[in-house]
Amino acid sequence: MNAKLIPLPNAKHLSDEEMKSRSEEFYRHIKQRRTVRDFSTEKVSRSIIDNCILAAGTAPSGANMQPWHFAVSGQGETRKIIREKAEKEERDFYETKASAEWLKALEALGTDANKPFLETAPFLIGIFVKSYGILPDGSQVKHYYAIESVGIATGILIAALHNAGLSTLTHTPSPMGFLNKIFKRPKNERPFLLLVAGYAEKGAQVPDIQKMSLGEISSDIS
């Protein structure tokens, strides 16, 4: 075994009471998170976004390869280009690609091909999966469980942004290949999703939908 090991940093053994309190507090906070489609143009400090990305970067990953990249776009001309290309793909989706069943499932969310939030929100974060790494000499390094790892990191990023007081929306135009050119990402990376981040517009509304209960999403096996 050649691994270099160190003591677990900040190891704590909390009481059951403290752990229960913390877990309940986190649940109360995170259950207030909602996907928002009406974003304010109010500016958000870039340092807040950077801190949340740093939190995402602490996610576990296969063989610690950390196969993610977060490309940040503030408000500017690039955002208009992203919106135009994304809406083109969305129109194709709604008009020709989506099945009737899929469109029916989307009705409760009130979505359509118009994506104004791609311009109005202060930040877009293009999240990319590194299919493989590239060493300084140009050779390739295999990445393990890259998609799963980036999915976990994205979840942490969404939770961190919510904790900071910001709203988010996950957007996945299909196909997303145009994002590589816009965000200037290399061929070993492919788009995972676009994360919209900012303050919700005053008076913003969200669909009247519910999350599943504990009994519906979990089970006990003896």
Identify the function of each model-found stretch.
Residues 55-57, 108-113, 179-181, 204:
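Glycine-rich, charged/polar anion/phosphate-binding loops
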Residues 2-18, 22, 112, 193-222:
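C-terminal helix-cap and adjacent tail motif
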Residues 72-150:
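Glycine/small-residue-rich phosphate/adenosyl-binding loop
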Residues 1-36, 40-48, 84, 92:
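N-terminal accessory segments that position/regulate proteins before the catalytic core
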Residues 91-98, 184-207:
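A glycine-rich helix N-cap at a beta->alpha junction
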Residues 33, 52-56, 125, 131-182:
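Small-aliphatic-rich amphipathic alpha-helix that forms the alpha element of a beta-alpha
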Residues 57-64:
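Glycine-rich phosphate/pyrophosphate-binding beta-alpha loops
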